[in-house]
Amino acid sequence: MRAVIPYKKAGAKSRLSPVLSLEEREEFVELMLNQVIDSLRGAGIEKIDILSPSVYGLEDMTKARVLLDEDDLNEALNRYLAGSEEPVLIVMADLPLLAPAHIKGISSTEKDVCIVPGKGGGTNALFIKNPSRYRVKYYGSSFLTHCSIATDTGQNFEIYDSFLAGTDIDEPEDLVELLIHGKGPAKEYISRKFRLEVSRGRVGLVLL
């Protein structure tokens, strides 16, 4: 099997712009990417590809193979799947709470496809045993779409339900979960800029 991580550093994570500058966001996404790669390697996955529209931020990448594709996410991933002859694990790059144990659980499924739901109907990871028979369709309620694609193509699927694997970092409030549950460079980076504060029974961020 092999893993592929879609990644784009330039202008990353615009929804974090209320709390992080462009430079900070680009530094942060690079840290998250490297943590995802380390988790994959910790789970015993050696074949790791980064699928990106640009080499920006990947010039010195040695932990994974960089594949350039300027098409949109779905076209690039579907081209990748069509050319794959072994099981593929698609993992998003913004999952700093993802651990090797999650990856082992996802990839050990007995089903044809394993789908990891993200917040708001998204898809954080997809393990596909027969990639040439499957097509992805991200954006919108992609979790439901990916379940339907599996059914429509005659493939059974498992839903891997995990709070940590299901927590992608897109919004400022997601940084709260990273500070509470995370560890490693991504958490350390955010903890140098923010601390947690409880107000009116809710946990929020306060700038240091």
From Swiss-Prot:
GO terms for molecular function: GTP binding; phospholactate guanylyltransferase activity. GO terms for biological process: F420-0 metabolic process. Keywords: GTP-binding, Nucleotide-binding, Nucleotidyltransferase, Transferase. Its EC number is 2.7.7.68. It comes from the Archaea. The keyword Nucleotide-binding applies. The keyword Zinc does not apply. Signal peptide: none annotated. Pathway: Cofactor biosynthesis; coenzyme F420 biosynthesis. It is an enzyme of class 2 (transferase). It catalyses: (2S)-2-phospholactate + GTP + H(+) = (2S)-lactyl-2-diphospho-5'-guanosine + diphosphate. InterPro entries: CofC (IPR002835), Nucleotide-diphossugar_trans (IPR029044). Guanylyltransferase that catalyzes the activation of (2S)-2-phospholactate (2-PL) as (2S)-lactyl-2-diphospho-5'-guanosine, via the condensation of 2-PL with GTP. It is involved in the biosynthesis of coenzyme F420, a hydride carrier cofactor. NCBIfam families: F420_cofC (TIGR03552). Homodimer. Belongs to the CofC family. This is 2-phospho-L-lactate guanylyltransferase. It comes from Methanosarcina acetivorans (strain ATCC 35395 / DSM 2834 / JCM 12185 / C2A).
